[in-house]
Amino acid sequence: MCMQEYSTCPTIDHDGLHKICCYSHSQHDCRDPVIDMPPCCYPTLVRKQKMTVNPGSKSHHPKAGLLSYLPAALVPYGELLRVHRALGYYLNTSPYVVGIAYSAATAPTKLPLDLLLDRLLLLTLWSFILRSAGCAWNDLIDVDIDRQISRTQSRPLARGAISLPTATIFTACLFALGCSLFLFLPRQCAFEAGIEVFFALLYPFGKRFTDHPQLILVNIAWAIPMAMHSLGVEPGRQILSSICLCVFIATVIVLIDLVYSRQDTEEDLKVGVKSMAVRYRDCIDTLAYSLFAISTLALLFGGLLGGLRAPFVVFSVGGHIVGFWTFLRASLQTGPAGVESRAKSSCLMASIFWLLGLGIEYAVRV
């Protein structure tokens, strides 16, 4: 039988991809685990891949970056939370910051600065914890897929640096810690947080059943009504402007994730992972620029319908156009390599101008 004729052990070839060394009696050759392995052996291969990792990769201590400052025992947990991937924290935190700044600029009466800072602190903490818990949950669900993608094979669960039971308990504690913050916020915020948690739990399953898992990420737009409710501002008072700002956040999130996920398209096709980058790989430029146009119009109308004027249009909308146009031109013309660094710099520039325009609008209020 197949299990008797073949035994497998993982090796690493020159391009960093896992190969499987197959021993068939006296013959020995290295084969691609997906393409070259006899079909009857594949279930055995998958089971053994789950149990075997490169022993040298279980524990390592980075010599540079944020992870290098952590004790060796905590490095896998830092990797699990993606503390060294600032872009993800930006994507989760900036909607709350924008929501608070927008509320301050459009509220019926000028909100006190100490209240704004208090809510900014609480919602920033929430966004950091939600992002961290979401990453850990995503790795728990995707551990088998991560072992088949070269970019994700070194993640702590995929390489066996953290056990699945330990990661499960750790993830549950993170979600519980995040939910405890809503003891200090209005009840409506807890309801909106529950919606965000639901979609965070749903997200890793999306790539298995739909070509549009990025659309699940639009739930991050709930940060806008949550920020408004935290300050006692009712989104329904200016429902159209609130909806426009939610559309703005949603399209920006989907746009960045769409461009970022291009780097895995070839391997996603082999493994069978679904995404918008895979589905629209032949027209991804058109889709990306369309999302960019929608986000720009949504931001513009969200401000105008909320009573904002020249400072918002010049700085917030203008900065968004310059920042994301630069990002798309660089990323779509030069390919997926280095997309994260380009996204961080361009998005940071855009965010500064978003807040500058909204901050000026708040400052000039009587």
From Swiss-Prot:
EC number: 2.5.1.-
Cystine residue pairs: none
GO cellular component: mitochondrial inner membrane
GO terms (BP aspect): terpenoid biosynthetic process; ubiquinone biosynthetic process
Enzyme class at the top of the EC tree: transferase
Major localization listed first in the record, in broad terms: membrane
Record CDD domains: PT_UbiA_COQ2
Subcellular locations according to the entry: Membrane
Cofactor list: Mg(2+)
Domain of life from the UniProt record: Eukaryota
Keywords: Magnesium, Membrane, Transferase, Transmembrane, Transmembrane helix
Pfam families noted in UniProt: UbiA
Disruption phenotype: Impairs the biosynthesis of calidodehydroaustin and accumulates the intermediate compound 3,5-dimethylorsellinic acid.
Membrane-crossing residue ranges in chain numbering: 97-117, 121-141, 164-184, 215-235, 239-259, 287-307, 308-328, 346-366
Functional pathway: Secondary metabolite biosynthesis; terpenoid biosynthesis
GO molecular function: 4-hydroxybenzoate polyprenyltransferase activity
Reactions mediated catalytically: 3,5-dimethylorsellinate + (2E,6E)-farnesyl diphosphate = (3R)-3-farnesyl-6-hydroxy-2,3,5-trimethyl-4-oxocyclohexa-1,5-diene-1-carboxylate + diphosphate + H(+)
Membrane topology value: Multi-pass membrane protein
Additional remark text: In A.calidoustus, the austinoid gene cluster lies on a contiguous DNA region, while clusters from E.nidulans and P.brasilianum are split in their respective genomes. Genetic rearrangements provoked variability among the clusters and E.nidulans produces the least number of austionoid derivatives with the end products austinol and dehydroaustinol, while P.brasilianum can produce until acetoxydehydroaustin, and A.calidoustus produces the highest number of identified derivatives.
Family, per entry: Belongs to the UbiA prenyltransferase family.
Role according to the record: Polyprenyl transferase; part of the gene cluster that mediates the biosynthesis of calidodehydroaustin, a fungal meroterpenoid. The first step of the pathway is the synthesis of 3,5-dimethylorsellinic acid by the polyketide synthase ausA. 3,5-dimethylorsellinic acid is then prenylated by the polyprenyl transferase ausN. Further epoxidation by the FAD-dependent monooxygenase ausM and cyclization by the probable terpene cyclase ausL lead to the formation of protoaustinoid A.
Protein name as annotated: Polyprenyl transferase ausN
Organism: Aspergillus calidoustus
The encoding gene: ausN
